[in-house]
């Protein structure tokens, strides 16, 4: 039987990752790994590896903040059933990394197997991570399962944005995917806090007993969101957001600032929602863990983008006195 191999190498420390699989297996097994360190005034990529369908691009520097702007590139155009892709990143002390994608994450129709994406992010002491990919678009009949796990060291901060479309809205394809399962878990260095899963509202109504079974008990000092959507078989799983086309979550978590900063940011974000009645509907809450969570639904992609960019700008200014960057997507 023929075998196939994918290779990729990094800038910085040379590293080659080889992926070997039987062609008879369904889907691709792709891994993307990054390691960042602070050197002088900049964050630099010191080690990386990737395997198909991921493609490696070195970070860019769009301003003088020293932030390493890192693009997650899948040139194949999306995920199909049976794909299992992963992203792992380690940020050492005092680094600042922004990870994004050049276009939407498309998930294509599948007859049986889901497309799976697993993300594991480790943020070192006093480091900053912004995980801000473009929206996920599940096509009609698609199956998608995603998990994002973040570990925060003392003084670390994460901005985590996760948005999903109801489908290919321009083609009048709405809530026609087979299933979407999502799990986000952010573990902080704080101890002695009550489990905060109850403080983080699940974005869509779930039928009793229909939440994903893979999630472990919530550790103390953690923020967890889990949901499962099955629009065709369980229409009630979509809940009240069925009349909207975009659903998004934003988590801003970290112990580098005090409670008064989070309260001020909560008020600023609430004011942004008040300026867009009818176009978006959202809420913001502080948590048992240090930080806040934002939930929102939007009528259109432009409404989602404008609101997200306004919130992102407010968060960056309040936390770091930095403007929102121009990511120059083409």
Could you say what each language-model-derived stretch is?
Residues 3, 8, 12-14, 18-136, ...:
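N-terminal, charged/glycine-rich beta-strand/loop interface patches
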Residues 19, 193, 204-206:
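Leucine-biased recognition of intrinsically disordered, low-complexity hydrophobic segments
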Residues 29-33, 67-68, 84-86, 116-118, ...:
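Broad gene-expression machinery/nucleic-acid interaction feature
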Residues 113-176, 180, 184-185:
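Internal, conserved structured core segments that host functional sites
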Residues 162-189, 218-330:
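A structural signal for small-residue-enriched, beta-sheet-centric alpha/beta enzyme cores
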Residues 189-195:
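Long, compositionally biased low-complexity repeat segments characteristic
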Residues 198, 205-213:
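Short Gly/Ser/Thr- and charged-rich N-terminal loops/segments
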């Amino acid at each position: 039987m023929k075998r196939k191999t994918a290779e990729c190498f990094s800038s910085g420390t040379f590293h080659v990752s080889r992926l070997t699989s039987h062609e008879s297996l369904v889907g691709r097994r792709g891994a993307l790994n990054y390691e960042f360190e602070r050197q002088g005034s900049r964050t630099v990529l010191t080690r990386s590896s990737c395997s198909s369908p991921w493609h490696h691009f070195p970070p860019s520097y769009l301003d003088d903040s020293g932030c390493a702007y890192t693009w997650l590139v899948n040139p194949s155009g999306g995920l199909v059933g049976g794909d299992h892709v992963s992203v792992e990143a380690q940020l050492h002390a005092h680094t600042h990394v922004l990870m994004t994608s050049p276009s939407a994450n498309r998930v294509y129709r599948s007859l049986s197997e889901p497309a799976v994406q697993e993300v594991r992010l480790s943020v070192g002491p006093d480091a900053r991570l912004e995980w801000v990919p473009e929206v996920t678009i599940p096509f009609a009949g698609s199956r998608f399962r995603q998990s994002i796990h973040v570990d925060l060291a003392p003084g670390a901060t994460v901005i985590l944005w996760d948005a999903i479309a109801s489908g290919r809205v321009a083609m009048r394809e709405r809530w026609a995917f087979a299933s979407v399962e999502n799990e986000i878990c952010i573990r902080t260095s704080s101890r002695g806090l009550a489990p905060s899963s109850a403080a983080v509202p699940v974005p869509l109504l779930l039928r009793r007993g229909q939440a994903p079974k893979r999630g472990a008990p919530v550790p103390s000092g953690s923020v967890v969101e889990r949901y499962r959507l099955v629009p065709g078989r369980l229409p009630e799983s979509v809940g009240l957001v069925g009349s909207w086309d975009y659903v998004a979550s934003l988590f801003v978590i970290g112990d580098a600032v005090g409670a008064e900063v989070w309260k001020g940011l909560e008020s600023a974000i609430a004011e942004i929602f008040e300026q867009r009645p009818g176009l978006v509907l959202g809420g913001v809450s502080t948590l048992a863990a240090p930080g806040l969570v934002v939930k929102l639904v939007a009528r259109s992609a432009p409404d989602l983008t404008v609101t997200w960019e306004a919130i992102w700008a407010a968060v960056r200014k309040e936390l770091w006195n930095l403007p929102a960057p121009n990511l120059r997507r083409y």
